[in-house]
Amino acid sequence: MGEKPGTRVFKKSSPNCKLTVYLGKRDFVDHLDKVDPVDGVVLVDPDYLKDRKVFVTLTCAFRYGREDLDVLGLSFRKDLFIATYQAFPPMPNPPRPPTRLQDRLLKKLGQHAHPFFFTIPQNLPCSVTLQPGPEDTGKACGVDFEIRAFCAKSIEEKSHKRNSVRLIIRKVQFAPETPGPQPSAETTRHFLMSDRRSLHLEASLDKELYYHGEPLNVNVHVTNNSAKTVKKIRVSVRQYADICLFSTAQYKCPVAQLEQDDQVSPSSTFCKVYTITPLLSDNREKRGLALDGQLKHEDTNLASSTIVKEGANKEVLGILVSYRVKVKLVVSRGGDVSVELPFVLMHPKPHDHITLPRPQSAPREIDIPVDTNLIEFDTNYATDDDIVFEDFARLRLKGMKDDDCDDQFC
């Protein structure tokens, strides 16, 4: 029999190693009707804490300008959501009892570990990063979620980097289990001096939902009853990013293009299936392209389509991402014809892990010294499986140079 796999837990310590935050995951899923709760544990050195308190904050922020342009007290950043939790001393009426993971961590880490809990509102945007240009420095623009733990006498007191922990988490969405109808569109163009003859274009996709890296099959059917000749057919995939902040603006960027010299003569028909695949690897140099939030040692991808719950307040949302396929007929002597097909580009929903029920009774555990620097804790207690601790990753884009170790994400 093989060894039982451990439960992975992410950790990150303050520069002075007096404060350590533990989280069971970095990605929190928006299920439209609810969002996964943020439950973690903070471990504190009691000799260092003295008469101070331990606070944990969750912030959702939208950075819409370069960090090096923040001058004269002006910041190109808007906080969309801020929540604060006092981890120590514990509140007299905690919002909820510890989760199973928190309970296990509290037992392993000892009496100086304290739980914290946050609920992410449903109307907040998902984590999106706008791809920086080659000359851009500092933090990339976009929407991110940050957890910060620090020691202070009050929440208003300014915290210091040496005794605080900052780490980035992601709010993500996965593909719906039931996709929508097959996208299709058609249009007819009548030309002057053509004796009421027309050029008809019909296009469709084989389905509405595609996963990242999956090719799109675009079915194009042309009926040319006009006197003009279709010289070329262009198929492109465009990303649309609606920036909802002080006002709403839409930016579009082609992420895949295909051009074929397929001619359609007058009084003839044409039918063909074009295959096109939108990939980030073909768009590395495009500044402002929306990407999914990325973690260290993990390559990112084009931003997933945003699914908005019906009735949601779009003014609160930071970046809404959508995709369309555009089919264009290049006609001789002008008068091009085109249609657009909206589709959804997302990651598939991963298989849910089976959570074993908590045992009704358990033998009393013996207090043993715990080395919090260990990567893996081996125990033989039947009521608790192994926990594997992994250092929390710093948020960066692939190809970007690492900053100094005092960076808040290191």
Curated annotation (Swiss-Prot):
The modification Phosphoserine is found at residue 361. It comes from the Eukaryota. Changing residue 54 to A: Inhibits internalization of EDNRA and EDNRB. It is found in: Cytoplasm; Nucleus; Cell membrane; Membrane, Clathrin-coated pit. Residues 378-410 are annotated as: Interaction with AP2B1. The modification Phosphothreonine is found at residue 383. It holds the Pfam family Arrestin_N. Changing residue 18 to R: Promotes agonist-stimulated down-regulation of CHRM2 and CHRM1; no effect on internalization of CHRM2. Residues 241-410 are annotated as: Interaction with TRAF6. PROSITE patterns: ARRESTINS. GO terms for cellular component: basolateral plasma membrane; clathrin-coated pit; cytoplasm; cytoplasmic vesicle; dendritic spine; endocytic vesicle; endosome; glutamatergic synapse. SMART domains: Arrestin_C (SM01017). The modification Hydroxyproline is found at residues 176, 181. One of its GO terms (molecular function) is alpha-1A adrenergic receptor binding. Disulfide bonds: none annotated. Changing residue 394 to A: Abolishes interaction with AP2B1; no effect on interaction with clathrin. The keyword Transcription regulation does not apply. Predominantly localized in neuronal tissues and in the spleen. Phosphorylated at Thr-383 in the cytoplasm; probably dephosphorylated at the plasma membrane. The phosphorylation does not regulate internalization and recycling of ADRB2, interaction with clathrin or AP2B1. The ubiquitination status appears to regulate the formation and trafficking of beta-arrestin-GPCR complexes and signaling. Ubiquitination appears to occur GPCR-specific. Ubiquitinated by MDM2; the ubiquitination is required for rapid internalization of ADRB2. Deubiquitinated by USP33; the deubiquitination leads to a dissociation of the beta-arrestin-GPCR complex. Stimulation of a class A GPCR, such as ADRB2, induces transient ubiquitination and subsequently promotes association with USP33. Stimulation of a class B GPCR promotes a sustained ubiquitination. The modification Phosphotyrosine is found at residue 48. Functions in regulating agonist-mediated G-protein coupled receptor (GPCR) signaling by mediating both receptor desensitization and resensitization processes. During homologous desensitization, beta-arrestins bind to the GPRK-phosphorylated receptor and sterically preclude its coupling to the cognate G-protein; the binding appears to require additional receptor determinants exposed only in the active receptor conformation. Homooligomer; the self-association is mediated by InsP6-binding. Heterooligomer with ARRB1; the association is mediated by InsP6-binding. Interacts with ADRB2 and CHRM2. Interacts with PDE4A. Interacts with PDE4D. Interacts with MAPK10, MAPK1 and MAPK3. Interacts with DRD2. Interacts with FSHR. Interacts with CLTC. Interacts with HTR2C. Interacts with CCR5. Interacts with CXCR4. Interacts with SRC. Interacts with DUSP16; the interaction is interrupted by stimulation of AGTR1 and activation of MAPK10. Interacts with CHUK; the interaction is enhanced stimulation of ADRB2. Interacts with RELA. Belongs to the arrestin family. This is Beta-arrestin-2. It comes from Rattus norvegicus (Rat).
